[in-house]
C-alpha cells in the first residue's frame, strides 16, 4: 500500500519505490521517482520540459487528503499534457483542453487514465479533447442524493497495489457502470500495470450504495414466497430435462437394435450366397482336378523322341564306363609299345566297344588282370 508495486524508475532503475511517482505524458511508459524528478533526470527521448503527472500511493493519498470532503468535480489534481499546467480536475481539464488546445493533434498520454484505477497508464491519443469528451465527461458520483462524497477510499492515484505488473503490456477491455462509477458507459484500456485491487474498490463502492439505498432494496427485494416459486420452477425444469433425456436414450437404443437386426440379416444372406456359389463351383473344380491328373498320366513324347533319348543315355553310359576303366587300368611303362597295343586289342576283345553293362565290364577286367599275373616278367633291359 505504501509502494508503487510493479513500477520501476527509468532513471535509477529502483523498483517498487516509495513516495511520489511522476508519469511522463509525452514519452511512452516513462516513470521517475521523486528524487530523480527533482534532480532533473533526462534521456535522449525525455527532457525536463515534458509534462509530468504526479501519482501518489494509497498511504500518501490518505495522508494528504485524509478527513477532507471533495465535491464530485474535484477528486484529484491533473496535469495538462500539452502545456504542463497542473491542478485541473476532470471537468476543468476538459474545459481547458477544449478552449486552449482544441486544434492540437500531438500524441499524448491521458493523465486521467494514468492516475485513476481502472485506466490504461499508457493510453496514447492524438485527439485528447475527443477522448476527454467520450471517456471522462460524466461525473463519478456514488450517491445521487448527496452532493459531496469522501473520495479517500474511492479514487486514489496509487496503482500497483495489488501485485506485480508488466511495464510494456496493455490489456484492453470495456467496462460500463451505472450509479457507482459512472452514469454512462466508460471504455478503459487497463494493462497489467494496473495492479491495484479493483475488487476491493468495487466492494467499498457497493457498500456505500447499499447504505444509501438500503430501504429501497428492502422494499423491492424478493420475498421468501418468490424464492420458493423460483425453486419449484427450477425443479420442474430439471424434471422436464431429465424426461427428455430418457426419451432420447430410448430412441437411441431402439435405433441401435434395428441396426443390429439389419446387420445380422445382411450377414446371413451373404453367407447363404457364398455357400450356393461354393456348391456350384465344386463339380467344376472336381472336373478340373481330374483333367489335370489325366494330363499327367498321358505320354508326352513320341516314339522318335524316346529312341533318341535312349541312344543319348547309351552314349552317356559308354562314356562313364570308359572313364571308370581308364582310371582302374594300371599304367605300364612307356617303352613297351607292343604290350600297349596288345592291351588295347585285349580291351577291344572284351567287347567294351559295344554297349555293355558296367558289372560285365568289371568282370572282364578282373579276368584280364588274373591272366597277366600268370605271365613271366619281361627280361631286364
Swiss-Prot record:
Please state the residue ranges covered by C2H2-type zinc fingers.
78-101
- UniProt keyword annotation of 4Fe-4S present: no
- Which portions of the sequence form the region Disordered? 154-194
**Group of enzyme by EC:** transferase
Pfam families per the record?
A: zf-Di19 (PF05605), ZZ (PF00569)
The terms under GO molecular function for this entry are: ubiquitin protein ligase activity; zinc ion binding
> Which pairs of positions does the record mark as disulfide bonds?
none
Cell location: Cytoplasm; Late endosome; Lysosome
Documented EC number(s): 2.3.2.27
Instruction: State where composition is biased (Low complexity).
Output: 175-192
Q: Which residues bind Zn(2+) 1?
A: 9, 12, 33, 36
Tissue specificity as recorded in UniProt: Testis, liver, kidney, heart and skeletal muscle.
Write out the GO cellular component annotations: cytosol; late endosome; lysosome
Post-translational modification N-acetylserine, affected residues:
2
Q: What does this protein do?
A: E3 ubiquitin-protein ligase which accepts ubiquitin from an E2 ubiquitin-conjugating enzyme and then transfers it to targeted substrates, promoting their degradation by the proteasome. Together with UBR4, component of the N-end rule pathway: ubiquitinates proteins bearing specific N-terminal residues that are destabilizing according to the N-end rule, leading to their degradation. Does not ubiquitinate proteins that are acetylated at the N-terminus.
Subunit-level organization: Component of the SIFI complex, composed of KCMF1, UBR4 and calmodulin (CALM1, CALM2 or CALM3).
Listed name of the protein: E3 ubiquitin-protein ligase KCMF1
User: What organism, scientifically named, is this protein from?
Assistant: Mus musculus (Mouse)
